[in-house]
């Protein structure tokens, strides 16, 4: 991670951490780097989610880009994976997403895709950070006809939906599904896509007001969807997050289907069809032990990376694997896209369900998960840095994991996107792992937060 760019772009509270001044500097730095690397006036797409601060940050970012000579094409509210796809379809030099994904509305972020549809390499982000650090001092600003122009595109959602329809290539006739769009960026595409595939659809979380993105809805708040599915007699439920780069689901009984389960189901299907490249699925250290053991039983290899879809993607690209993702619902299908895509993932899962002739609860029951306790400890940047340097705390955590022996594991890490230290304890004995997590959290509070 760089000074400003975390695992998923620049993130923070809009107007406080991520200011208009910062957005303009990012725009100027990005335009300068792209002009230098391409040798021409760059074309840059901008998409955003439904946060109230999105318009403000887009205006500042656009001003920065145009002031150094880049042309901007505004896509409006679109999913993050739509930008990753459209930057390639429209032969743009880069695509920018203004979103904080699953985070509350007061947060926002700026993430940049290269013209290839992949996130910018670290070295390019470092070049942009250098411009930010020196306030773009000495950077020649455009004048006259060299100033960038701004146009608005209205064809993005249709082109993206056409791409999804062709990639899913399925018939969902006979399925009755409830879809939660998190009051975010997925609604327009989802309302076109899933009925077009033949499903009977009921949509919730489709009334964004700038403030209610991810608020009690979407993939981080499945309760409402699970209740709606059971009460409405739906075959299953699908939930996206605010920018639709992740997807979780629930079966007809209201039981959650997490990213691990989705990856397992899709990977098994790909293996049957002979398209599971390398016979491997790439996951992160957060994946459940029950998932890992099940995949072994199916003869499918798993490779683990650090938490973050960018690390999953790096491994997939380096080794030629076709599927990877995270327990949180990021699933990357490299045969079709360059990033996590919630709507593509949902379509593939629903296609599998429709062809199986089985209930979603039967698919959901392919393996039993080990109990898992997750606790987030609020921590600022200084506290996160102190945690990384605390040898006494590291020894304490290692000792706690040893107490679980082969029946569980402990993972403590600092979040790359939020002001938190995340504590995860997993094992067969729920009471034991709950106590273990409590002891670790208490020790973190004692040494780092309150100390």
Regions found by a protein language model. Give the residues of each.
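An N-terminal, well-structured beta->alpha segment
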Residues: 1-63, 67-68, 150-175, 384-385, ...
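Short glycine-rich phosphate-binding loop at a beta-alpha junction
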Residues: 39-49, 73, 176-178, 279-285, ...
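Proline/glycine-rich low-complexity loops and linkers
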Residues: 75, 126-161, 166, 252-325, ...
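Phosphate-binding and adjacent anionic-ligand microenvironments
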Residues: 236, 273-451
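Gly/Ser/Thr-enriched, mixed-charge loops and adjacent short helices
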Residues: 13, 108-232
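N-terminal small/polar loop signature for handling phosphorylated ligands or for N-terminal nucleophile
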Residues: 32, 36, 40-107, 192-250
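Short glycine-centered, acidic/aromatic-flanked micro-motifs in structured strand/loop junctions
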Residues: 47-49, 179-181, 251, 335, ...
């Amino acid at each position: 991670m760089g000074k400003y760019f975390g695992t998923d772009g620049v993130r923070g509270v809009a107007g406080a951490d991520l200011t208009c001044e910062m957005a303009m500097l990012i725009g100027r730095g990005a335009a300068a780097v792209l002009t230098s690397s391409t040798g021409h006036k760059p074309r840059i797409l901008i998409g955003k989610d439904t946060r109230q601060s999105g318009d403000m940050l887009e205006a500042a970012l656009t001003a920065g880009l145009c002031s150094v000579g880049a042309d901007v094409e505004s896509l409006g509210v679109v999913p993050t994976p739509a930008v990753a796809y459209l930057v390639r379809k429209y032969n743009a030099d880069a695509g920018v997403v203004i979103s904080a994904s699953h985070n509350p509305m007061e947060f926002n972020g700026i993430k940049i895709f290269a013209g290839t549809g992949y996130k910018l390499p670290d070295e390019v982000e470092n070049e942009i950070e250098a411009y930010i650090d020196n306030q773009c001092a000495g950077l020649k600003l455009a004048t006259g006809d060299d100033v960038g122009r701004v146009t608005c595109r209205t064809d993005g959602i249709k082109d993206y939906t056409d791409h999804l329809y062709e990639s899913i290539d399925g018939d969902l006739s006979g399925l009755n599904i409830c879809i939660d769009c998190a009051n975010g960026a997925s609604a327009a595409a989802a309302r076109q896509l899933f009925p077009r595939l033949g499903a009977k659809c009921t949509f919730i979380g489709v009334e964004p007001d700038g403030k209610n993105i991810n608020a009690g809805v979407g993939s981080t708040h499945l309760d409402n969807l699970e209740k709606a599915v059971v009460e409405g007699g739906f075959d299953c439920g699908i939930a996206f997050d605010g920018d639709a780069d992740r997807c979780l689901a629930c079966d007809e009984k209201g039981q959650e289907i997490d990213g691990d389960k989705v990856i397992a189901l899709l990977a098994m299907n790909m293996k049957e069809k002979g398209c599971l490249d390398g016979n491997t699925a790439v996951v992160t250290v957060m994946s459940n032990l029950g998932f890992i053991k099940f995949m072994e039983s199916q003869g499918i290899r798993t490779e683990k990376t650090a938490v973050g879809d960018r690390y999953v993607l790096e491994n997939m690209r380096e080794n030629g694997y076709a599927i990877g993702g995270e327990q949180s619902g990021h699933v990357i299908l490299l045969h079709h896209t360059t990033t996590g895509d919630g709507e593509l993932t949902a379509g593939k899962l629903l296609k599998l369900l429709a062809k199986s002739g089985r209930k979603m609860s039967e698919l959901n029951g392919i393996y039993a998960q080990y109990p898992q306790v997750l606790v987030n400890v609020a921590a600022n940047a200084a506290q996160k840095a102190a945690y990384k340097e605390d040898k006494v705390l590291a020894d304490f955590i290692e000792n706690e994991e040893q107490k679980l022996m082969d029946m569980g594991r402990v993972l403590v890490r600092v979040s790359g996107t939020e002001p938190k230290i995340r504590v995860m304890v997993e094992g067969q004995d729920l009471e034991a792992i709950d106590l273990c997590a409590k002891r670790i959290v208490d020790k973190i509070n004692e040494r780092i937060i309150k100390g």
